[in-house]
A protein has these predicted regions:
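Rhodanese-like catalytic fold shared by cysteine-dependent sulfurtransferases
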Residues: 2-19, 26-58, 67-100
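Short, surface-exposed ligand- or partner-binding patches at beta-edge/loop junctions that are enriched
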Residues: 62
Length: 100
């Protein structure tokens, strides 16, 4: 990435110019999620490529610890979707959003 920092990406998200994509299960999402996030569980990412393609960029993908979001980010990038970032785990990402 050319000078794109997580701060800039989060700024876009806060300005409602991007998308927070939660790839945890529906149950996990219903228990708690970052405000404004969209839930598409990891096993549904591939079948939702066309839908995800139309979401506002940047897209920040997160899960519980960063594992599933890493896989989802790879899937999206391999399908030609640009401006997609692995935001890691929900708690660290939420802290980052609240502190930036």
């Amino acid at each position: 990435e050319t000078g794109i920092t997580m701060q800039n990406i989060i700024k876009s998200i806060k300005e409602k110019k991007g998308t927070l994509l939660d790839v945890r299960s529906k149950i996990e999402f219903e228990e708690n999620h970052i405000a404004g996030a969209i839930n598409i569980p990891l096993d549904m990412v591939e079948v939702n490529i066309k839908n995800i393609e139309t979401m506002p960029k940047p897209i920040v993908v997160y899960c519980l610890s960063g594992g599933r979001s890493g896989i989802a980010t790879d899937i999206l990038q391999q399908n030609g979707i640009e401006d997609v970032y692995n935001g890691g785990g929900i708690f660290s990402l939420n802290n980052f959003i609240n502190n930036n």
